[in-house]
């Protein structure tokens, strides 16, 4: 709701005011990797860094593991961290130092994780010392103080536990911190998000033998988590609801433990949740979470439930609207009006026409593709998407939407892409609408077979994701072009991309490679698409390898020529209508994130800015500080003024801050935020800062796997991306004597980022781990084989684990 406060002046008076002089002041930080490598006191340099240094730390080259990120260097950082914790008294400047040191450690572990299998791990002793640093911090009486800097320190030092993978050492202190959650502390969702790092770490320790052993000896923690969720059920009606949801969800994930008592207690909690929050009740997302965990790890607990009927009932309630486009799309939605759905149809029709022209398809589908219709399922918000989509459609939800092709050769198949709206006004505001629709079109007209068929020989992810990005952005993809100065990738490297690589390489560099090929070598693209349309993916991979080597030098030169070209509006998407006419002389200026802009102004003057918040932003706040009396007003996706705004914390003086809490998925809503700095009186030397931290650009943790088990079928190959661990299972019917499993790497062994290594473990009675299993194949690389004798019907369970660098692998099962 808008908070509107009228001042005794007219809008026209503001427009006619003479603009006062502004001056820019940017922080100069010696935090680049090269500067840190030359620093005589690394801990001091890290301690004094600003927020915008983090990107350089997380994106540092693997060579830094020999200097600033070496074991010896981190040992000295750990000593400095303990010293700072010992003297911590809750002061903001002290907290900033702690956060900097914590982020530096996390960056080191992230760089190590991405360095490949040839680089030694940090020692267990070092990781344990960092875990003890977290304990030391949480035992400090000021550890849970509130305030921007204080919360930043708490979040960094608790999330560090997942990086060093030492939750068994910190579980007690993190559980004790959780008990400080109450109605007062719940008001600060950033603080609550710091407590939530316990559950991030629990998810990150799935299939971790040390964690499962710890929980087997400390099952009282399951009782504590159940009481926590029950006692704090009131929080389900607040913005802090995610902490209760995640407490129960991660309790459910303990069903994967091989320890029977752990599993028994976790199952009892899930059954209690289902009874307390039945489907159709106000907080039935907890029922859904319990069902999801049980269906993955304890399906026997769901006997007697008609889940298919439950899905139909839920879909009818959550997505009641249906609109058929004249083309292939059928739009199901939670809150789109018919007029909005019709506009979406226009957008998709325009995109389809553009697609056929760019890809030169002749409107001819590939053979055996029966997906002549596609269902577009649009949730009203990210919260709804996270709550319901996985249960209804089986997709993961830690993303901006997903295309689910199914098996295109089956007549009863339903092609579907699932999306959500990032705003609920008159505009469509459907995230990644064109990107996901391009996936449907590309699969139907350019790619023979299923998604697994497409990935079977590698060298195609650059096209699948890069082409979808190109069709959405064309020449206007600023985020991709902005990557170039930070370090070029060769075309061959981009062509070798798999889904186990980072999002920049998959999407943005994929876009650059596709754009280069379409603009400079369209005939080669035609030749490649002729191969993919006929299912010749091995030949595709061979040809792409040749083209990469052939055009590497040209691609490098071409990158230097790029600049952003703004595309005209697509047909059917009207420009946003302003709430009031905008005066011609009013200018809205882009505000650079994480940089201080110093402003001065007269009474009643107004300065307008905007800042773009990208996807995967974990922290965003806008603040002013200075002399005089200036006020801060903001709006989302529309120009903000003092007389028309959505958010403000205006007060006497020029010291104000607006914080934006993350949504249920842990990220701040992406989009454009507008800022009005208005003089209630004159003001001078006021610093305006939009501080944000983006996980996609500076990944704070290793990429998370989809931990939902993949159900295998005999004779059908499945391709899985494994970062750290994945689960799979196959149901073996009566009469089968032996199950044989082949796992093969889909990556290029010559990839400069290093070949992966995924090990395969199997058990018949429980989910296996690296220590507790019945069968194992753990050779070097990701090519593994198991022959498993069976004597009765039931599931065989598999765990795929990457001790260092992950990989894309294909699993194939046969019964004998």
Curated annotation (Swiss-Prot):
<dbReference type="GO" id="GO:0006508">
    <property type="term" value="P:proteolysis"/>
</dbReference>
<dbReference type="Pfam" id="PF08453">
    <property type="entry name" value="Peptidase_M9_N"/>
</dbReference>
<protein>
    <recommendedName>
        <fullName>Microbial collagenase</fullName>
        <ecNumber>3.4.24.3</ecNumber>
    </recommendedName>
</protein>
<keyword id="KW-0732">Signal</keyword>
<feature type="binding site">
    <location>
        <position position="435"/>
    </location>
    <ligand>
        <name>Zn(2+)</name>
    </ligand>
</feature>
<keyword id="KW-0862">Zinc</keyword>
<keyword id="KW-0479">Metal-binding</keyword>
<dbReference type="Pfam" id="PF04151">
    <property type="entry name" value="PPC"/>
</dbReference>
<dbReference type="InterPro" id="IPR007280">
    <property type="entry name" value="Peptidase_C_arc/bac"/>
</dbReference>
<dbReference type="InterPro" id="IPR013661">
    <property type="entry name" value="Peptidase_M9_N_dom"/>
</dbReference>
<feature type="binding site">
    <location>
        <position position="439"/>
    </location>
    <ligand>
        <name>Zn(2+)</name>
    </ligand>
</feature>
<feature type="active site">
    <location>
        <position position="436"/>
    </location>
</feature>
<keyword id="KW-0177">Collagen degradation</keyword>
<keyword id="KW-0964">Secreted</keyword>
<comment type="similarity">
    <text>Belongs to the peptidase M9A family.</text>
</comment>
<dbReference type="GO" id="GO:0030574">
    <property type="term" value="P:collagen catabolic process"/>
</dbReference>
<dbReference type="InterPro" id="IPR002169">
    <property type="entry name" value="Peptidase_M9A/M9B"/>
</dbReference>
<dbReference type="GO" id="GO:0004222">
    <property type="term" value="F:metalloendopeptidase activity"/>
</dbReference>
<keyword id="KW-0865">Zymogen</keyword>
<keyword id="KW-0482">Metalloprotease</keyword>
<keyword id="KW-0378">Hydrolase</keyword>
<dbReference type="GO" id="GO:0008270">
    <property type="term" value="F:zinc ion binding"/>
</dbReference>
<keyword id="KW-0645">Protease</keyword>
<dbReference type="Pfam" id="PF01752">
    <property type="entry name" value="Peptidase_M9"/>
</dbReference>
<dbReference type="GO" id="GO:0005576">
    <property type="term" value="C:extracellular region"/>
</dbReference>
<feature type="signal peptide">
    <location>
        <begin position="1"/>
        <end position="27"/>
    </location>
</feature>
<comment type="function">
    <text>Possesses gelatinolytic activity. Can cause weak haemolysis on blood agar.</text>
</comment>
């Amino acid at each position: 709701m808008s908070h509107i406060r009228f001042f005794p002046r007219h809008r026209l008076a503001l427009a006619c005011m003479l603009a006062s002089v502004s001056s820019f002041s940017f922080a100069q930080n010696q935090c680049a990797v090269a500067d840190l490598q030359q620093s005589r006191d690394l801990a001091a340099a890290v301690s004094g860094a600003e927020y915008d240094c983090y990107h350089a730390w997380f994106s540092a080259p693997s060579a830094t593991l020999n200097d600033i990120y070496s074991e010896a260097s981190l040992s000295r950082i750990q000593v400095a961290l303990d010293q700072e914790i010992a003297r911590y008294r809750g002061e903001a400047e002290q907290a900033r130092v702690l956060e900097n040191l914590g982020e530096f450690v996390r960056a080191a572990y992230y760089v190590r994780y991405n360095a490949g299998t040839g680089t030694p791990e940090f020692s267990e002793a070092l990781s344990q010392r960092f875990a003890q640093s977290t304990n030391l911090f949480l035992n400090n009486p000021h550890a849970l103080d509130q305030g921007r800097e204080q919360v930043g320190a708490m979040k960094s030092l608790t999330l560090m536990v997942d990086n060093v993978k030492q939750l068994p050492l910190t579980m007690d202190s993190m559980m004790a911190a959780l008990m400080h959650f109450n109605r007062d502390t719940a008001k600060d969702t950033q603080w609550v998000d710091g407590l939530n790092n316990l559950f991030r770490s629990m998810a990150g320790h799935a299939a971790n033998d040390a964690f499962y052993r710890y929980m087997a000896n400390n099952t009282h923690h399951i009782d504590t988590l159940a009481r926590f969720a029950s006692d704090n059920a009131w929080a389900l009606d607040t913005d802090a609801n995610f902490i209760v949801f995640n407490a129960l969800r991660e309790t459910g994930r303990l069903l994967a433990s091989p320890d029977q008592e752990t599993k028994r207690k976790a199952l009892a909690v899930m059954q209690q949740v289902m009874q307390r929050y039945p489907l159709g009740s106000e907080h039935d997302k907890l029922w859904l979470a319990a069902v999801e965990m049980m269906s993955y790890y304890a399906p026997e607990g769901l006997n007697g439930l008609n889940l298919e009927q439950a899905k139909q009932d839920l879909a009818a309630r959550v997505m009641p609207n249906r609109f058929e486009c004249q083309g292939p799309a059928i739009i199901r939605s939670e809150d789109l009006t018919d007029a909005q759905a019709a506009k979406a149809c226009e957008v998709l029709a325009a995109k389809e026409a553009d697609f056929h022209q760019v890809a030169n398809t002749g409107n001819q589908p590939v053979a055996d593709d029966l997906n002549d219709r596609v269902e577009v399922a649009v949730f009203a918000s990210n919260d709804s998407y996270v709550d319901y989509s996985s249960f209804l459609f089986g997709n993961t939800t830690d993303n901006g939407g997903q295309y689910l092709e199914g098996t295109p050769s089956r007549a009863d198949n339903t092609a579907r892409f699932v999306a959500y709206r990032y705003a609920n006004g008159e505009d469509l505001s459907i995230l990644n609408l064109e990107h996901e629709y391009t996936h449907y079109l590309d699969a139907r007209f350019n790619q023979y077979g299923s998604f697994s068929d497409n990935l079977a020989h590698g060298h195609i992810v650059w096209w699948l994701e890069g082409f979808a990005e190109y069709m959405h952005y064309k020449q206007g993809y600023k985020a991709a072009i902005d990557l170039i100065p930070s370090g070029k990738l060769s075309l061959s490297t981009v062509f070798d991309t798999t889904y186990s690589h980072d999002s920049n390489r998959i999407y943005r560099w994929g876009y650059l490679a596709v754009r280069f090929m379409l603009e400079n070598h369209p005939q080669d693209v035609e030749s490649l698409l002729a191969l993919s349309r006929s299912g010749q993916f091995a030949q595709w991979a061979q040809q792409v390898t040749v083209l990469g080597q052939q055009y590497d030098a040209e691609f490098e030169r071409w990158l230097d020529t790029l600049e952003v070209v703004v595309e005209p509006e697509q047909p059917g998407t009207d420009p946003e209508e302003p709430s009031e006419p905008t005066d011609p002389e009013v200018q809205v200026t882009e505000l650079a994130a994480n940089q201080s802009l110093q402003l001065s102004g007269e009474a009643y003057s107004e300065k307008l800015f905007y800042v773009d918040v990208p996807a995967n932003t974990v922290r965003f706040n806008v603040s002013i500080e200075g002399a005089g009396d200036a006020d801060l007003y903001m709006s989302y996706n529309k120009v903000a003024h003092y007389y028309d705004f959505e958010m403000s914390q205006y007060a006497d003086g020029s010291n104000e801050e607006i914080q934006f809490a993350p949504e249920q998925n842990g990220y701040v809503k992406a989009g454009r935020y507008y800022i009005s700095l208005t003089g209630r009186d004159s003001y001078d030397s006021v610093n305006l800062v939009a501080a944000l931290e983006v996980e996609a650009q500076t990944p704070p943790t290793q990429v998370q796997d989809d931990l939902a088990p993949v159900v295998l079928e005999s004779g059908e190959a499945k391709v899985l991306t494994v970062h750290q661990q994945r689960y799979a299972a196959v149901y073996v019917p009566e009469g089968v004597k032996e199950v044989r499993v082949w796992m093969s790497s889909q990556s290029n062994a010559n990839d400069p980022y290093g070949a992966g290594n995924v090990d395969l473990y199997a058990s018949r009675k429980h989910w296996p781990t690296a220590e507790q299993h019945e069968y194992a194949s753990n050779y070097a690389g990701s090519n593994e084989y198991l022959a498993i004798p069976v004597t009765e019907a039931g599931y065989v369970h598999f765990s795929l684990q990457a001790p260092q660098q992950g990989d894309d692998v294909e699993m194939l099962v046969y019964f004998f």
